[in-house]
Amino acid sequence: MSYMIAVPDMLSSAAGDLASIGSSINASTRAAAAATTRLLPAAADEVSAHIAALFSGHGEGYQAIARQMAAFHDQFTLALTSSAGAYASAEATNVEQQVL
């Protein structure tokens, strides 16, 4: 038989830490958006224009992936927070039943 131990306070703390990390990553991603998606050509020739467009495309691709990862991160953090509340409620109910 396997046992699982969940400490609600630790889950809440982890959710808070994850939210803080996510905020930092999102701020960094927003700060880098203009510099990575709107590159100017190094010269006025066709090759420089294509290279700048290529790298801008990579930057836009990163921004799209970053948005998806931010959404996943938010959902995961919410699930962790909800789990902490559920475990705390279950623990309180268990203690209450033992007292009766």
Predicted features, each with a name:
Residues 1-100:
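A glycine-centric feature that highlights glycine-enriched low-complexity/repetitive segments
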